[in-house]
Amino acid sequence: MSIGILGKKLGMSQLFDEQGKAVPVTLIEAGPCRITQLKTTETDGYSAVQIGFGETRDKLVNKPAKGHLAKSGEGVLRHLSEYRVDDVNGLELGGAVTVSDFEAGQKVDVSGDTMGRGFAGYQKRHGFSRGPMTHGSKNHREPGSTGAGTTPGRIYPGKRMAGRYGGKKTTTRGLTILKVDSDRNLLVVKGSVPGKPGALLNIRPANRVGAKPAKGGK
């Protein structure tokens, strides 16, 4: 049973299928993750599993977190994540969650922070068309109209404008696991995932599995 796992993006590569077609893949170093807490309906009101990933220096973790992590084993962990489950039977505090809990062909959802690109303009951030480049135009990469005048006398919230681009959490759904390497803690996932190499990723079984419905709901 795969509940979910934390990992680190290593980068992208490619595999060749049986027809010799190149398939883009992402290599993810996932786990091993330590089970740091088991939540039950009797004590917490719901059933869940909390896991930790990525050992870090002792001085970077405060005392409450150290006390919490000490209940599940030695060593402090940098990242924690919780997954809802139907039942925690069969799971043990201090146990390990590894890539062997996943299998090739399984669909997963991968969450992470997108690449931060800093302050960006209208064209780069939103894909706006630019203005004329010649004939005396000075409106090359400007936004154009941002709204009416005296009425409403303001710019409506949500107006697409220049600003910080990227660096936000997003989820890529329905990715297929092509290969599982238990010896090297690797997941080979078809396609791309959020973030740059070294970024933290949250991998969990897909919650939307099946063919997409046709337009009109038929």
From Swiss-Prot:
Region (Disordered): 125-168
Keyword rRNA-binding: yes
TM region positions: none
Protein name in the entry: Large ribosomal subunit protein uL3
InterPro entries in the record: Ribosomal_uL3, Ribosomal_uL3_bac/org-type, Ribosomal_uL3_CS, Transl_B-barrel_sf
Biological role stated in the UniProt entry: One of the primary rRNA binding proteins, it binds directly near the 3'-end of the 23S rRNA, where it nucleates assembly of the 50S subunit.
Gene Ontology MF term list: rRNA binding; structural constituent of ribosome
GO biological process: translation
Species this protein is from: Synechococcus sp. (strain WH7803)
Key words, A-Z: Ribonucleoprotein, Ribosomal protein, RNA-binding, rRNA-binding
Family: Belongs to the universal ribosomal protein uL3 family.
Highest taxon in the source lineage: Bacteria
SUPFAM superfamilies: Translation proteins
A cellular component term, taken from the record's GO annotations: cytosolic large ribosomal subunit
Description of how the protein assembles with itself and partners: Part of the 50S ribosomal subunit. Forms a cluster with proteins L14 and L19.
